[in-house]
Amino acid sequence: MSDVQERLKKLGLGARTGTGKGTPRRKVKRAPARSGADDKKLQLALKKLNTQPIQAIEEVNMFKQDGNVIHFAAPKVHAAVPSNTFAIYGNGEDKELTELVPGILNQLGPDSLASLRKLAESYQNLQKEKGEDDDEIPDLVEGENFEGEPKVE
């Protein structure tokens, strides 16, 4: 009987709910609070600037100095044109220029075109280096026909 009571005490120690005197309260694990207060402050500041939402913007790309791009897919954009202020909401992703190349060519300015040229030159240099290391491809010998049945010697 006392053996059973000891086992119950061991099990009960981990699950104290705070019903008796002197027992610590159980900690409630909470998710981190959302930044709702910051969003409200930002909305008030944008309202003071008289920003208007801009519809039908599919993507926003911000080009960084190191050649990478901050890419926003389907962002919310607010603008105050008289004060030259734009606010972009959404999840931004750091991407390399090569990841966005086919669709981003019409958005490139002179600085970005220079980085694209450097990227293309480095790619060509890599291709030249790979061309020099073609040890896997044998050279063709004149007068030999490799399309027929193999000759066993």
UniProtKB/Swiss-Prot annotation:
GO terms for cellular component: cytoplasm; nucleus. It is found in: Cytoplasm; Nucleus. Its main location: cytoplasm. Residues 132-147 have a biased composition (Acidic residues). Residues 1-40, 126-153 are annotated as: Disordered. GO terms for biological process: protein transport. InterPro entries: BTF3, NAC_A/B_dom_sf, Nas_poly-pep-assoc_cplx_dom. Residues 36-101 form the NAC-A/B domain. Residues 23-32 have a biased composition (Basic residues). PROSITE patterns: NAC_AB. It comes from the Eukaryota. Gene3D superfamilies: Nascent polypeptide-associated complex domain. Keywords: Cytoplasm, Nucleus, Protein transport, Repressor, Transcription, Transcription regulation, Transport. Part of the nascent polypeptide-associated complex (NAC), consisting of EGD2 and EGD1. NAC associates with ribosomes via EGD1. Component of the nascent polypeptide-associated complex (NAC), a dynamic component of the ribosomal exit tunnel, protecting the emerging polypeptides from interaction with other cytoplasmic proteins to ensure appropriate nascent protein targeting. The NAC complex also promotes mitochondrial protein import by enhancing productive ribosome interactions with the outer mitochondrial membrane and blocks the inappropriate interaction of ribosomes translating non-secretory nascent polypeptides with translocation sites in the membrane of the endoplasmic reticulum. Belongs to the NAC-beta family. This is Nascent polypeptide-associated complex subunit beta. It comes from Gibberella zeae (strain ATCC MYA-4620 / CBS 123657 / FGSC 9075 / NRRL 31084 / PH-1) (Wheat head blight fungus).
